[in-house]
Amino acid sequence: MTKTLLIEEKAYLGGTATGAQVSMFMGFADGEPDRPQQGIIKDVMDGLAAAGGTPGIETIYLCGRRDLDIPVIPYESEILKDLIFDLVDQAGVELLLHTRVIGAQVEDGVITALTIHNEQGVQTVSGKVVIDASFHGSVAVSAGCRWEIGDEKGVLQPGTLMYKMAGVDIARYEQVSQPERERLAQKGIEEGCLYVNNLLARPLPSGTIYSNMSRIRIDPLDAAQWSRAEMEARRQVRRISRFFIENVPGFE
């Protein structure tokens, strides 16, 4: 009988979708937001809806422009954590949390086994098929696969730290016009409190607001640089949230 083993370094599944509180599936509808979704994403959407974790597919307009419409699904990340555990359990998947892959054994160009590490020490697991869904493609790289990072100049998309705010008067905030949002954003940039030229804060079913407004240049392959970035990102979030409280209607 075929068995599936899922290895995860964290205490939860879902990667950045859950652990980083991304809170929005974006651009998966292939330009047809009204078409019923199938497969795994349908299971996820149905489960989130049943648990009150999503309002379903919505359309957002980047920078308030009607020609930049994108279908998205806002969701509650904690509800998604529970849902993914349930789906994995129902599918009969064996799970190893708090476990990291530290190497791959390759024969004739095929991965035959993985070296893993957890509190039980270093172990080896083998399988016929290995699917690398790691953040950096670490399994594929350790197996000798080619890799690239950044554009032709090595420039990467900046890092960001998602955060949430509660107690917001969402109705008042949603009345703020796009020109006013851009004016406030420019004010925040000039004061050294904001880092993007728009107010990127949207509501979730729970009534909280999630935001993606910090921006940090970082090489994610440099652990020391990444560590400093984690601290700076939190400083940025404090500046951003304070600016919202002092300047944006609904956040007082």
Give each language-model segment a name.
Residues 137-252:
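Rossmann-like dinucleotide-binding core of oxidoreductases
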